[in-house]
């Protein structure tokens, strides 16, 4: 996964602590260093992917989710287009591009280009991430197969 960014808002050109925490997490994510990503989170945190209707409060489970995303979308590239920040919150607008292999006809697969815009809202407390929420279009992202691995089935 590649993550790059350019800040389009002059007010956010000067990095603040919340910006640095987010950028450290995104850089580690791009490099596949999930231990470093998880180190940026508080012990008590919430990571919510609203498109997939998934919520993580456990670092091990979040690490599994991030690894599964990388496995299914190894060429993904997340580019930050705008960053807005306040005292303890960073909002990042981004574009995610990737390719996805999916079944086609009977036994073949086809590669489908993925391009989706999204927003991450990240709250920082004591220099660590306490809440991270991602918002984007589930259908365009084609991430639903990954989500199925993390959905708990309840017998009725």
Regions found by a protein language model. Give the residues of each.
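C-terminal and inter-domain tail/linker signature
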Residues: 1-156
């Amino acid at each position: 996964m590649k993550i790059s960014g350019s800040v389009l808002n002059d007010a956010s050109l000067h990095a603040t602590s919340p910006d640095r925490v987010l950028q450290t997490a995104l850089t580690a994510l791009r490099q596949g260093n999930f231990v470093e990503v998880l180190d940026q989170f508080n012990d008590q945190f919430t990571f919510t992917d609203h498109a997939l209707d998934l919520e993580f409060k456990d670092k091990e489970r979040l690490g599994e989710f991030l690894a599964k995303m990388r496995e299914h979308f190894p060429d993904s590239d997340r580019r930050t287009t705008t960053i807005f920040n306040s005292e303890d919150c960073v909002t990042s607008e981004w574009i995610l591009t990737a390719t996805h292999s999916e079944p086609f006809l009977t036994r073949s697969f086809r590669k489908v280009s993925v391009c989706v815009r999204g927003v991450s809202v990240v709250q920082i407390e004591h220099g660590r991430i306490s809440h991270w929420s991602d918002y984007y279009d589930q259908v365009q992202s084609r991430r639903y197969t990954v989500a199925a691995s993390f959905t708990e089935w309840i017998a009725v």
